[in-house]
A protein has these predicted regions:
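Catalytic and substrate-binding clefts that recognize carbohydrates or anionic sugar/phosphate headgroups
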Residues: 1-89, 99-100, 105, 112-117
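Catalytic domains of carbohydrate-active enzymes, especially glycoside hydrolases
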Residues: 17, 81, 107-130, 151, ...
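Structural beta-strand/beta-sheet cores of well-ordered domains, especially the beta-sheet scaffolds
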Residues: 17-19, 28-30, 52, 59-62, ...
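An acidic, carboxylate-rich microenvironment
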Residues: 73, 106-107, 150, 215
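N-terminal small/glycine-rich loop or linker at the start of catalytic domains
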Residues: 81-98, 195-208
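Short, acidic/polar
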Residues: 103-118, 216-226
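Aromatic- and carboxylate-enriched substrate-binding clefts and catalytic-loop regions
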Residues: 121-252
Length: 252
């Protein structure tokens, strides 16, 4: 499982993100893609220098062996399986500024002013979790970023695109429409007994939308319109490995 922990040393078995594609080169070059959402152990020459051992904790998985004479051929075949990338808009190729975190609009303005004074072109500024109301997805803190739609438009006139973060965990809070819809419709990941799995990330206790389900992807995806209607035209999808700080019942 993934772990949102910056200290990834030899004693840390969990990576920050899971990418279940590996390309091996030796007497034969080939790729392996494992289509499985749960725990996988990768031992790449660690126990035995010339051996790779992959251990999958489960039975319901697919393994793709991708043959090819050159790495580029293998990568192209892999992308055919998972889907090719879309072509980003031109402005997305410009210089982008991000950090954790800009606490209010004034902090963003100061960064933009700094770039202008230094004569450095800037196209995008990323908004981390502090733009949200108590770290709730698809909300804006009106005290920190008042008149957000107008602010987005003002920055656009300055040539700056604002890219807000969206986390995979939906805050458990009565009256919060995103959470209420997810709970009512059974959109969150479940425990073995059918109850909602609950874990902790930035907002506290959250539910995790089950993105393996097309109906959940469609539901969650429709919520981005809340921000696109305010002029936002790019997003930073984060914590979607999923990252988790702790769980209520513990992880087995």
């Amino acid at each position: 499982f993934c772990s949102d922990d910056p200290f990834h040393t030899e004693t840390k078995s969990s990576l920050y993100a899971a990418h279940n594609f590996l390309m091996l080169s030796g007497s034969k070059t080939f790729g392996i893609f494992i289509d499985f959402p749960s725990k996988i152990r990768w031992d790449i020459g660690y126990t035995t220098a010339n051996k790779t051992v992959i251990t999958i904790d489960g039975t319901n998985f697919d393994i793709y062996y991708i043959d090819g004479t050159k790495p580029l051929e293998i990568v192209k075949e892999f992308r055919k399986s998972i889907g090719t990338s879309y072509v980003p808009p031109f402005w997305a190729f410009g210089y982008q500024q991000s950090r954790w975190s800009y606490h209010n609009a004034e902090a963003v303005d100061a960064v933009v002013d700094g770039y202008n004074k230094a004569g450095i072109p800037l196209d995008c500024v990323y908004l981390d979790i502090d733009y949200m109301e108590r770290y709730k997805d698809f909300t804006v803190d009106d005290e920190k970023f008042p008149n957000f739609k107008d602010y987005v438009s003002k920055k656009r006139e300055e040539g700056i695109h604002l890219i807000p973060i969206i986390d995979a965990g939906v805050k458990k809070e009565n009256g919060y429409d995103i959470y209420e819809e997810g709970r009512k419709n059974g959109y969150f990941c479940k425990n073995e007994d059918g109850t909602d799995f609950e874990g902790g990330v930035w907002p506290g206790i959250v539910g995790f939308p089950d993105f393996l389900r097309p109906d959940v992807r469609k539901w969650f995806g429709s919520k981005y319109k809340i921000l696109t209607d305010m002029g936002i035209d790019g997003f930073w999808n984060d914590m979607n490995e999923p990252a988790i700080f702790y769980s209520v019942k513990g992880l087995n």
